[in-house]
UniProtKB/Swiss-Prot annotation:
It holds the Pfam family S-AdoMet_synt_C. Binds 2 divalent ions per subunit. Binds 1 potassium ion per subunit. The lineage of its organism: Bacteria, Bacillati, Cyanobacteriota, Cyanophyceae, Synechococcales. This is S-adenosylmethionine synthase. GO terms for cellular component: cytoplasm. It is found in: Cytoplasm.
Length: 419
């Protein structure tokens, strides 16, 4: 019997890097909502009293970027007397956006391998490799460690916003360690929560008393509600529970650490449980395959698992800049597939159109901001891009496609042919 512990982390929306991801995606939403053909590569930097957006944008949209940035920061919770050194109302906002390089634009606008099909005309915005993953550990077909870490982070933000724990401040991180036996989760080994807070908590100022009060409150108002519907639940008797291990966490957010777009790519995906191609998502329009192809790879992997063709599936895609069709497609089922990896790969090649133009069209990636009232990508920028029961994400809707795959495999077996 194999036994091991696997750990994943999440961060709250007030973490400096996540502020940047949300600002970058808010810029993307605003541009696409007005002009669905916008080309966007927006990077954000935050530090004490400063937020700067930079990158490349080609768009007909007219956006008040400074007002937009302040609104995002304010909604996260950095405003007023408790904002510290990063206040939405007074921080400097710098805008340094250029146009997209014409050398890149020509490859995206007119793919090298098009032969009359309009979808062949949309080439990949860059070369790269992308991975998608799914497994049957949770209802949303995500690994349990990252799923639980996100639950804790979302709940941590919720009790701050609704005033349940009014001493909490926006910055925070969670980490969950899960015990596996024979690749199945069997227990929650450790829960770690680091959360920013006011210097005084419920009339207490002694550091030890403050820490104990926060620990008790988080167990009652965060840990227990976040895990209430899980078959595996943490226990004070058997689960190691750590809160603010350094003792206190008063100085946080951009005042404590600078932030940058794209520095939480493992938090954004599978918590390290699956491989990652290295490309970030936030601030990038759908022609960037770092984003759109990673969404498609997740969709494919989730379809395979939802169809019962594998208990675990990892899908790798690769692209060349300016070329529409993927350079390669590979499925790995880690020995859990009902058929071989080669057969699963061929099934994917037959039933999924993974050209960037087709991905964009299927998931309406250019139209989603306008269809969602001007806010779509921004909501993916905190608490993960996959396995989000709180959001209606088109790449997570696999029921119909999974049924098609199951029927195709059943038909193949009936005919006695290989794929």
């Amino acid at each position: 019997m194999s036994r091991y512990v696997f750990t994943s982390e999440s961060v709250t929306e007030g973490h400096p890097d996540k502020i940047c991801d949300q600002v970058s995606d808010a810029v993307l939403d605003a541009l696409l909502a007005q002009d669905s053909s916008s080309r966007v590569a927006c990077e954000t930097v935050v530090n004490t009293g400063l937020c700067m957006i930079t990158g490349e944008v080609t768009s007909k949209a007219q956006v008040d970027f400074i007002h937009l940035v302040r609104d995002v920061i304010r909604e996260i919770g950095y405003s007023g007397a408790r904002a510290g050194g990063f206040d939405a109302n007074s921080c400097a906002v710098l805008v340094a956006l250029d146009q997209q390089s014409p050398d890149i634009a020509q490859g995206v606008d007119e793919a090298d391998d098009h032969e009359g099909d309009p979808l062949d005309k949309v080439g990949a915005g860059d070369q790269g490799i992308m991975f998608g993953y799914a497994c049957n550990e949770t209802p949303e077909l995500m690994p349990l460690p990252i799923s639980l870490a996100h639950r804790l982070s979302r709940r941590l933000a919720e009790v701050r916003h609704n005033g349940t724990l009014d001493y909490l401040l926006p910055d925070g991180k969670t980490q969950v360690s899960v015990v596996y036996e024979n690749d199945k989760p069997v227990a929650i080994d450790t829960i770690l929560i680091s959360t920013q807070h006011t210097a005084e908590v419920a009339g207490l100022s002694d550091e030890q008393q403050v820490r104990e009060r926060i620990s008790d409150d988080l167990w009652t108002h965060v840990v227990e509600p976040a895990t209430a519907d899980l078959p595996l639940k943490p226990s004070k008797d058997s689960t190691r529970y750590l809160v603010n291990p350094t003792g206190k966490f008063v100085v946080g957010g951009p005042q404590g650490d600078a932030g940058l777009t794209g520095r939480k790519i493992i938090v954004d995906t599978y918590g390290g449980y699956a491989r990652h191609g290295g490309g970030a998502f936030s601030g990038k329009d759908p022609t960037k395959v770092d984003r759109s192809a990673a969404y498609a790879a997740r969709y494919v992997a989730k379809c395979l698992v939802a169809a019962g063709l594998a208990q675990r599936a990892e899908v790798q895609l690769s692209y060349a800049i300016g070329v529409a069709k993927p350079v390669s497609i590979l499925v790995e089922s880690f020995g859990t597939g009902k058929v071989s990896n080669a057969e699963l790969t061929e099934l994917v090649q037959q039933h999924f159109d993974l050209r960037p133009g087709a991905i964009i069209q299927q998931f309406k990636l250019r139209e989603m901001p306008a269809l969602s009232g001007g806010r779509f990508y921004r909501d993916t920028a905190a608490y993960g891009h996959f396995g989000r029961p709180d959001l209606k994400l088109p790449w997570e809707d696999v029921e119909n496609k999974a049924s098609t795959l199951l029927q195709a495999e059943a038909s193949r077996l009936q005919q006695g042919n290989t794929l």
